[in-house]
From Swiss-Prot:
One of its GO terms (cellular component) is membrane. It catalyses: a UDP-3-O-[(3R)-3-hydroxyacyl]-alpha-D-glucosamine + a (3R)-hydroxyacyl-[ACP] = a UDP-2-N,3-O-bis[(3R)-3-hydroxyacyl]-alpha-D-glucosamine + holo-[ACP] + H(+). GO terms for biological process: lipid A biosynthetic process. Pathway: Bacterial outer membrane biogenesis; LPS lipid A biosynthesis. SUPFAM superfamilies: Trimeric LpxA-like enzymes. Belongs to the transferase hexapeptide repeat family. LpxD subfamily. The gene is lpxD. One of its GO terms (molecular function) is N-acyltransferase activity. This is UDP-3-O-acylglucosamine N-acyltransferase. Homotrimer. It comes from Neisseria meningitidis serogroup C / serotype 2a (strain ATCC 700532 / DSM 15464 / FAM18). Keywords: Acyltransferase, Lipid A biosynthesis, Lipid biosynthesis, Lipid metabolism, Repeat, Transferase.
Amino acid sequence: MIPATYTLSQITARLGGEWRGEDISVTAVRPLADAQAEHISFLANPKYKAEVHDSSAGAVIVSAKAADGFEGRNLIVADDPYLYFAKVARLFSPVVKARGGIHPTAVVEPSATVPASCEIGANAYIGANTVLGEGCRILANAVVQHDCKLGDEVVLHPNAVVYYGCTLGRRVEIHSGAVIGADGFGLAFAGDSWFKIPQTGAVTLGDDVEIGSNTNIDRGAMSDTTVGNGTKIDNQVQIGHNCKIGSHTVIAAKTGISGSVTIGSYCIIGGGVGTVGHIEIADKTTIGGGTSVTHSITESGKHLAGIFPMSTHKEWARNAVYIHRLSEMNKRLKTLEQQLSDAGQDSK
């Protein structure tokens, strides 16, 4: 495929911003350290300004404040250089559209609805009574079981699985190995063994949701597990049954959300976070990587961190200073206690 080429003026005409210097052509986005004359790079953090001076990039995306330090360079000045970089990267890597057609080895049940605009890959399976929207891409070995409903332009990458009865909104993307709608972990103890509770709910994903590789979102026990519009979930995340996750929340890899947790909108949850079940996390909460969330967070906008116990980020950072000194402090405390005890004995 011939690489796309854009001049700086063409980029700003599409995305806004202001170009300065020569109206050069660029063919790709690269990091400052690797960029060459045909590439465009970006400066998101001012502390890396020195890298701009050392870079061979043909052009650099910068903020208006930073631009004054780079006279003579080809620039695009943007309010948010990092977001602008993401949009430029999308220009060079456009969303792949479905090539209509069903591979001869795919299996589509007769009662399924598959528009001609959909692309069904090799060995893929579409179950009975499932309805696909326009322009879906169900790639090799992906499975959509019976009675599902997929919106327009949904993408299932190879070996992704959507269990029966689930609903996916428009432009949902499910990466390889992810499983949507497997049974939740619901068991009742029967005295000498565990009795499995039928999981009769399903999973509902809103528009523009993205689910990473090998992530599992379990179906609800009686009502649906839900994920709101625009939420992005990384690889190897476990979402337990009955969870309700709001819109535009992001969850990083290796996080485990126990059953019946409600998470608000615009939350940021770092990698390796674990939660107990049946709690609520307010809108716009930020949870640092590795945090154990043991109780509800009711105040919106909190920034929490700490392996254990959970606390505000400010409290955790202040207390973390002392962790490596605990042994020394314990020795000093014992010495002081002994001195006080000796002083008490001497006064008798």
